[in-house]
Amino acid sequence: MPHKTEMARLVDRSSAAAIALRSVNTVEVASDGALVGHSTDGQGLMQNLRSHGVRLENSSVLVIGAGGAGRSVIDALTRHGCVHVTVANRSLEAAEFAVGFAPGGSRAISLSDEPALRRATQECDLIIHATSMGMGETGSEPVLPMPMDMLQQRHIVVDLVYHPLNTALLRAADEKGCQIVNGLGMLVHQAALQQEIWTGHLPDIQEMLSAASQALS
């Protein structure tokens, strides 16, 4: 998940979305030999949320993370009917930049500002964790991006982390009765879009999901 911002500075040119987001997760070798950057994260997440029946119209969302993945998510949420986003990040400066991709009236907060984080959680319908925190966790020391007492049963909780599939955040949310969505679907949907960029053909999503699930289980 890291290095997408750095990659945006290394390619020869980028798609309009990748330029705006300053995030590249896909590099295409063009016919002239140039390295062309693309961002498929946001579209991949939207397709995954749709497959889980998550509706974004008129929704309020808390996004934890303001890196390349977080910015892509925020931009996609805005394009798909979300009306308010709170961006929570360790660096308030990064959160303030990322909130520029959100609908008007959205706000940026520091993850260390617990009262603001609690208020944002109370106001939102959907919580999306968009950092690498928890990636590769063993379970011996659960890594949580926020205090779990903030979660309510009505929340939909999405974790972009896909290894492990059932992160500490998702386990805690499941115990609260929340609808949970792990990171595998987004990984697969955005990877399918990458394959389409590279080969011109969109692969079978279900076959990819099955193979990825087996590999990560």
Specify the residue positions occupied by each region the protein language model found.
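Phosphate/diphosphate ligand-binding glycine-rich loop within oxidoreductases
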Residues: 1-52
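Short glycine-rich anion-binding loops that position phosphate/pyrophosphate groups of nucleotides
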Residues: 1-6, 69, 132-135, 163
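Glycine-rich helix-loop-beta junction characteristic of Rossmann-like nucleotide cofactor-binding loops
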Residues: 51-55, 149-151
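NAD(P)-binding Rossmann-fold cofactor-contacting core
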Residues: 80-103
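Rossmann-like adenosine-cofactor binding region
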Residues: 104-180
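Glycine-rich adenosine-cofactor-binding loop
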Residues: 39, 54, 58-78
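Adenosine-phosphate binding glycine-rich loop
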Residues: 58, 153-156, 160-217
